A protein has these predicted regions:
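Contiguous, amphipathic alpha-helical segments that mediate oligomerization or scaffolding
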Residues: 81-82
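N-terminal export/membrane-targeting signals
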Residues: 1-24
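Amphipathic, charged alpha-helical segments and their helix-to-coil junctions
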Residues: 26-68, 72-75, 86-123
Length: 123
């Protein structure tokens, strides 16, 4: 129960702090993620990608623009989730699922999200 509470209150900037202490290359990861953010926001706004229920970006249709950006973002998210999992004594999969809930709560209207059962919907 305590872990759920911890994950429920972790905003994006805290993820950066946690990863900074847990992973030597954290500054580079954070910088890369920040640099990709405008492209990711645009892809979400166009309905090309959404946030899946595991905390990763996923293409929601046939159109796959900027695939290298999506792949790089997911790779860095995986590193972040692993580092947080190590600190929290859990798994990267659990961290990702909790992060997916946080992302869904902060998503903009019209963005694609995947619910816990795998069904895609627009917020």
């Amino acid at each position: 129960m305590k872990r759920k509470a911890i994950f429920a209150i972790l905003p994006v900037f805290v993820l950066g702090i946690l990863i900074t202490n847990a992973y030597p290359a954290s500054k580079e990861i954070k910088q890369r993620m920040i640099a990709r953010l405008p492209v990711i926001k645009a892809l979400k706004g166009q309905g090309i990608v959404g946030e899946n229920n595991r905390g990763y970006l996923q293409f929601v249709g046939q159109k796959k623009e900027k695939e290298e950006v999506v792949t790089a973002e997911n790779k860095d998210r995986k590193l972040v989730y692993k580092a947080i999992a190590k600190q929290q004594g859990t798994t990267a999969a659990v961290v990702g699922k909790h992060r997916a809930v946080q992302i869904a709560n902060k998503a903009q209207p019209g963005e694609w999200l995947q619910d816990a059962n795998g069904k895609w919907y627009q917020k």
